[in-house]
């Protein structure tokens, strides 16, 4: 899908590209999974070649942040959650050339959707491609900050479930959610660090206007403040995971202790029963009239003795 926006009194307005309106006035050209015709149109009208899928997936720094005859290129991760609430990072290719911003992505992303909604009512300050790029990065960081807050809130709920130590379906679900939150936190951290690298490259390589230079530095400060919070999430997740494993081990030890006590309690009666169950011709007790009840009483006493001993030692 191809979308294009122009500036009117420092406000973004959408160009009707479906009606064959020229892209020449566009300050922002946004492409989501473009087909060959859309790629060809951008190439023919604006002379801009677009990154291929393998180039988007390349993770080397030299392939993600560079400058060539086609402009300044930045490939950056954006966080998203799919329809099944599975978290992921999707690469967006940014290119700035001749005062125009090109964005190429493989899916619709929350940060882009939120920025377009804001742009309808908010005017830009300087109205240039760099401000557009930084506004998108700013929106991304806000989204990541919200995601960190959501993880904190979820961890508080999980903490109460885990610390109660009552194992069951709710406990199993808490452990599964804990692993999922750890994965989300890792993806958020990757996105923050990638954005930090992208902004450092932009500050070094691009001749940013004064307003955008300060905006970039402000976003970098926001990232610096979020990274420790993100790190503390991993520590909290690790603590809760260890606590959960500790409670599980305690419960398992309790079960094993019960089996151990049962086996020890039944061992002496079993010894008595096996002794009198031996098939020998000369066994004096076989001729006793009270031999059988006496053996039963002896077996009961042999079982009670270790049980009472364990009870006295507080092993039960």
Curated annotation (Swiss-Prot):
Highest classification ranks of the organism: Bacteria, Pseudomonadati, Pseudomonadota, Gammaproteobacteria, Enterobacterales
Free-text domain note: The central ion permeation pathway is formed by the first transmembrane domain from each of the five subunits. Mg(2+) binding strengthens interactions between subunits and leads to the formation of a symmetrical homopentamer surrounding a closed ion permeation pathway. Co(2+) binding also induces a conformation change. Low Mg(2+) concentrations trigger both a conformation change within each subunit and a loosening of the interactions between subunits. This results in an open ion conduction pathway. In addition, this results in a less symmetrical shape of the whole complex.
Motif extent (Probable selectivity filter): 277-279
Upregulating conditions: Constitutively expressed.
All ranges on the Cytoplasmic side of the membrane: 1-254, 311-316
Protein name: Magnesium transport protein CorA
Family note: Belongs to the CorA metal ion transporter (MIT) (TC 1.A.35) family.
Residue stretches spanning the membrane: 255-273, 288-310
Other known facts: Is the dominant magnesium transport system under laboratory growth conditions.
Subcellular localization, as worded in the UniProt entry: Cell inner membrane
Protein function: Mediates both influx and efflux of magnesium ions. Can also mediate cobalt and nickel uptake, albeit only at extracellular concentrations that are toxic to the cell. Does not transport iron. Alternates between open and closed states. Activated by low cytoplasmic Mg(2+) levels. Inactive when cytoplasmic Mg(2+) levels are high.
Pfam families: CorA
GO cellular component terms, A-Z: plasma membrane
Keyword rRNA processing: no
Outcome, altering residue 274 to A/C: Reduces magnesium transport by about 95%
Main location: membrane
Effect of residue 280 to A/R/W/Y: Reduces magnesium transport by about 99%
Record keywords, A-Z: Cell inner membrane, Cell membrane, Cobalt, Ion transport, Magnesium, Membrane, Nickel, Transmembrane, Transmembrane helix, Transport
Membrane topology: Multi-pass membrane protein
Positions on the Periplasmic side per record topology: 274-287
Gene3D superfamilies attached to this UniProt entry: Magnesium transport protein CorA, transmembrane region
Complex formation: Homopentamer. In the absence of Mg(2+), interactions between subunits are weakened, and dimers, trimers and tetramers can be observed in vitro. Homotetramer.
PANTHER family in the record: MAGNESIUM TRANSPORT PROTEIN CORA
Activation and inhibition: Inhibited by cation hexaammines.
Effect upon mutating residue 278 to A/C/I: Reduces magnesium transport by about 99%
Site features described as Essential for ion permeation, chain residue numbers: 253
């Amino acid at each position: 899908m191809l979308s294009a926006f122009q500036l009117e009194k420092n406000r973004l307005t959408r160009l009707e590209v479906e009606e064959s309106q020229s892209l020449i006035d566009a300050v922002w050209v946004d492409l989501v999974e473009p087909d060959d015709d859309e790629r060809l149109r951008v190439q023919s009208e604006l002379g801009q070649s677009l990154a291929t899928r393998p180039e988007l997936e390349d993770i080397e720094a030299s392939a993600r942040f560079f400058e060539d005859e086609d402009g300044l290129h930045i490939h950056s991760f954006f966080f998203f959650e799919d329809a099944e609430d599975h978290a992921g990072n999707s690469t967006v290719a940014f290119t700035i050339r001749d005062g125009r911003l090109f964005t190429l992505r493989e899916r619709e992303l929350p940060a882009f959707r939120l920025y377009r909604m804001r742009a309808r009512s908010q005017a830009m300050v300087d109205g240039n491609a760099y401000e557009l790029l930084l506004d998108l990065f700013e929106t991304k960081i806000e989204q990541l900050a919200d995601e960190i807050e959501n993880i904190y809130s979820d961890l508080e709920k999980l903490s109460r479930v885990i610390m109660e130590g009552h194992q069951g379906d709710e406990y199993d679900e808490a452990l599964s959610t804990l692993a999922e939150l750890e994965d989300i936190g890792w993806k958020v951290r990757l996105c923050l660090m990638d954005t930090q690298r992208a902004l450092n490259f932009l500050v070094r390589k691009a001749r940013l206007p004064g307003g955008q230079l300060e905006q970039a530095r402000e976003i970098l400060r926001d990232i610096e403040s979020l990274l420790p919070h993100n790190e503390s999430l991993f520590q909290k997740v690790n603590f809760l995971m260890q606590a959960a494993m500790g409670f599980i081990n305690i419960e398992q030890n309790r079960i094993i202790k019960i089996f151990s006590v049962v086996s020890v309690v039944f061992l002496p009666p079993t010894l008595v029963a096996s002794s009198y169950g031996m098939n020998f011709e000369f066994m004096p007790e076989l001729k006793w009239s009270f031999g059988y009840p006496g053996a039963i009483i002896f077996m009961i006493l042999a079982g009670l003795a270790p049980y009472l001993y364990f009870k006295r030692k507080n092993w039960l």
